[in-house]
Structure formats: structure tokens, C-alpha cells
Amino acid sequence: MTVGTLPIWSKTFSYAIRSLCFLHIIHMYAYEFTETRGESMLPTLSATNDYVHVLKNFQNGRGIKMGDCIVALKPTDPNHRICKRVTGMPGDLVLVDPSTIVNYVGDVLVDEERFGTYIKVPEGHVWVTGDNLSHSLDSRTYNALPMGLIMGKIVAANNFDKPFWDGSIRNIWGFKWINNTFLDVQAKSN
């Protein structure tokens, strides 16, 4: 070894550290690939083995629109994350539970007086629900979600229960795009 040169293992270690730092920055600020569990987003996402692609440039609610699927910190337990669909934006009037007047969500008793009532979503908050309303703990339970808890927008998912290859390049491991399902009826009628 000559003066001023590093052994090959030292260069390899240096490249590995740089790569890890780069991946950490991407994970923190740009993109995340994470698992989802639970029945609240059926049929959009499976109850198990669905992994979602999350874009973090939508963090803190930046650019979020009605109908987008998001990942957020759970307001009642910041150590857990939730995956829900935005069904109300700041200033919107939302019906607390449009599906039924039952006062149970799963096994959890929910305040019966709130059902059938309208709530105005406060500024800086969004109203979120699961696609499977009968099995979802969401804004109907913990009220409007502060936009500061939003970690990103879900744009796609992979279901690892599916075979790796089913003959289509578009369907590797059950890949699917997660679309915004909101249809603005007022805008369409004008």
C-alpha cells in the first residue's frame, strides 16, 4: 500500500456508509415502503400482507385532496400509524356516520349521540375514514385528524400473498395503483 491510498475494504466501507445515509434520507423525506394490517381499508387494501408505497412530499397534509389514501400517526396513540382515506377537508361539513346508526365500530362502543350529526372539519384538520366503515376506527371515533400527523400519501400497493409473476409485467407481486376515488358531483353537473 502506498501513502495516500486506502485499502479496498476501507473504500467499500465508505461507500456502504454513504449508501446507508442516502437511503435514510430517502426514507425520512421522500418515500417509504411499509406494511399495512387490518380490515379497515378492505377492499382497497388486503387485511394482511399488503405493503404500500408512500410519497412523503405530502407530509403534514401538503397537497392532500379529498379521496386520497394517507398514512398518519394515530391521534390516540402516536406509536402506531393508520391508513385511511380523506373524506373531509378543512371547512367541510361531514356526516359523522353515513352508513348506519349503530353505536359500535367492531367491538368498541362509540358515543351514540354523535351518530347522524354533522361536524364542521376545523382548519388544519381532515376527516378520515376507512373504506370498510363497519370495521374501521377513524375520525368517527377520534374526531378530525390534525394535518400535522399525516406522514404521506399512498400511491400504490403490493400484495405479497399473490404470486411473484402472473404473466403480466404490470402485476408483479400483486402490484396495484391506489387511486383517488372522490367524484365531485357538483363540478360534473356544471
Swiss-Prot record:
Assigned GO CC terms:
mitochondrial inner membrane; mitochondrial inner membrane peptidase complex; mitochondrion
Catalytic residue list? S40, K84
Q: What is the effect of changing G130S?
A: Abolishes processing of CYB2 and COX2 and presence of SOM1 in the IMP complex
Transmembrane stretches in the record are none
**Which residues pair up as cystines?**
none
Q: In UniProt terms, what is the effect of altering S40 to A/T? A: Abolishes enzymatic activity
Question: EC number(s)?
Answer: 3.4.21.-
Q: Name one GO molecular function term.
A: serine-type endopeptidase activity
Listed A to Z, the keywords are: Hydrolase, Membrane, Mitochondrion, Mitochondrion inner membrane, Protease
Q: Where in the cell is it found?
A: Mitochondrion inner membrane
What is an annotated GO biological process for this record, any one?
Answer: protein processing involved in protein targeting to mitochondrion
NCBIfam families tied to this protein: sigpep_I_bact
Instruction: Give the protein family.
Output: Belongs to the peptidase S26 family. IMP1 subfamily.
Q: How does it assemble?
A: Component of the mitochondrial inner membrane peptidase (IMP) complex which at least consists of IMP1, IMP2 and SOM1.
What's its job? Catalytic component of the mitochondrial inner membrane peptidase (IMP) complex. IMP catalyzes the removal of signal peptides required for the targeting of proteins from the mitochondrial matrix, across the inner membrane, into the inter-membrane space. The two catalytic IMP subunits seem to have non-overlapping substrate specificities. IMP1 substrates include nuclear encoded CYB2, mitochondrially encoded COX2, NADH-cytochrome b5 reductase and GUT2.
- The name this protein carries in UniProt is Mitochondrial inner membrane protease subunit 1
Organism, scientific name? Saccharomyces cerevisiae (strain ATCC 204508 / S288c) (Baker's yeast)
Please name the gene that encodes this protein: IMP1
